[in-house]
Amino acid sequence: MNENYYPIEINEAEGSFTIVNGGTAPAPCKITIIPKVDFMTLTITGLSDTPIEVSRVKTNDILVIDGEARQVLINDKDAFSSYNAWEFPKVQPGVNKISITNASQATIQIEYDTRYI
């Protein structure tokens, strides 16, 4: 990764937060979710035009939604059936208001590389 790579750990007490992308172009992001309970459902808003819903994930599975590679994996295996969204996540230039329902049910990390046009 380069010096413009930003990993963001989501504190379980937080359900809403902001990400400031200092770049001039949308930056595809990678979301890693490790559930603390089976079959949790999580809804993420602010990283796509429509909400991203994640479901059918078991405790301690590692779910990766990779906007750059356009993949959804659970424990390194295809898991697109657990992903319900029209597009892959990205961080827009400027301030992004992100909201995650049931954030306390998982450990969540969002990563992106700043992009410039």
Model-found features: residue ranges?
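Intrinsically disordered, low-complexity segments enriched in serine, threonine, and glycine
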Residues: 1-117
